[in-house]
Amino acid sequence: MGMLVPTALAARLLSLFQQQLGSLWSGLAILFCWLRIALGWLDPGKEQPQVRGEPEDTQETQEDGNSTQPTTPVSVNYHFTRQCNYKCGFCFHTAKTSFVLPLEEAKRGLLLLKQAGLEKINFSGGEPFLQDRGEYLGKLVRFCKEELALPSVSIVSNGSLIRERWFKDYGEYLDILAISCDSFDEQVNALIGRGQGKKNHVENLQKLRRWCRDYKVAFKINSVINRFNVDEDMNEHIKALSPVRWKVFQCLLIEGENSGEDALREAERFLISNEEFETFLERHKEVSCLVPESNQKMKDSYLILDEYMRFLNCTGGRKDPSKSILDVGVEEAIKFSGFDEKMFLKRGGKYVWSKADLKLDW
């Protein structure tokens, strides 16, 4: 009986010690867990415990936020007029209106684009030299280079209305002049609708090339490959003209422009297959400045502003306009542009586009 008392006492003391040890261990475990969180000791593959007060979907919210970042309009094509002096059968920006913004309103819109991140502006039409005999265009070009200090200012034109006087007045502010030339055969140009009576489109192209060299403007050629020129060999002509880029497009249908009931053109007869387009590219693979653009690459990879400064969404095979950036701002309007930035980069949309960086041998 005398032995039972010490034994019972020892058991009681052991039980109390175990309880205290358990409490101490629990406290240490909690402390260690917080140290791991604070010092970043958690395994990268394991989920970290949620801190009280932090939303459960923080990571998802951040990912969603990243995906809804506003699109930056790095490169924009501004079709400020739809009027043209040519009648190309496959044209996909036709003369459905005669509207042109007042010059100061156009400048205001360009300033908004600059503030949103614009680096390159490309003026197109229609025929951009048609408005005020090129003076409207020249003033916009000068404004973009001199006041907005854009790295690149370019123009796409059929070239028929350009005079040397324009180069003298505005050439220093222009980085790239792209001339549309679909064929070096005048009969083919006439079939396409790129002809003006006795004027020779090819001879005019050569004259423009000289002026670009004389006034230090980078020279570029755009060609739309279609049913009438798909078998042509342009190698020697392109090499002789030596453009900085030769953009080769596959003829494209846009509902309401060159296809469908409301269209001003019927381009179906100009269409070629993907295989025919690839054959043309293969024939010209030795031309180092060749930049091909199939219909797939063109789709949704351009930011296009129309004459009202509305972004045009072409994802549905037609041109659905946003509200004007002059009314709602760039960030709001660009949400409806349908722009595919990945395809823009994939097609080579970002390149050396400033003549200061091109370092050409004038």
From Swiss-Prot:
Keywords: 4Fe-4S, Acetylation, Antiviral defense, Endoplasmic reticulum, Golgi apparatus, Immunity, Innate immunity, Iron, Iron-sulfur, Isopeptide bond, Lipid droplet, Lyase, Membrane, Metal-binding, Mitochondrion, Mitochondrion inner membrane, Mitochondrion outer membrane, S-adenosyl-L-methionine, Ubl conjugation. It comes from the Eukaryota. Signal peptide: none annotated. Its EC number is 4.2.-.-. Expressed at higher levels in atherosclerotic arteries than in normal arteries. Residues 47-73 are annotated as: Disordered. There is a cross-link at K207 (Glycyl lysine isopeptide (Lys-Gly) (interchain with G-Cter in ubiquitin)). Its cofactor is [4Fe-4S] cluster. It is a peripheral membrane protein. The modification N6-acetyllysine is found at K198. IRAK1 and TRAF6 synergistically activate RSAD2 increasing its activity with CTP as substrate about 10-fold. Pfam families: Fer4_12, Radical_SAM. It is found in: Endoplasmic reticulum membrane; Golgi apparatus; Endoplasmic reticulum; Lipid droplet. It catalyses: CTP + AH2 + S-adenosyl-L-methionine = 3'-deoxy-3',4'-didehydro-CTP + 5'-deoxyadenosine + L-methionine + A + H2O + H(+). Belongs to the radical SAM superfamily. RSAD2 family. Interferon-inducible antiviral protein which plays a major role in the cell antiviral state induced by type I and type II interferon. Catalyzes the conversion of cytidine triphosphate (CTP) to 3'-deoxy-3',4'-didehydro-CTP (ddhCTP) via a SAM-dependent radical mechanism. In turn, ddhCTP acts as a chain terminator for the RNA-dependent RNA polymerases from multiple viruses and directly inhibits viral replication. Therefore, inhibits a wide range of DNA and RNA viruses. This is S-adenosylmethionine-dependent nucleotide dehydratase RSAD2. It comes from Mus musculus (Mouse).
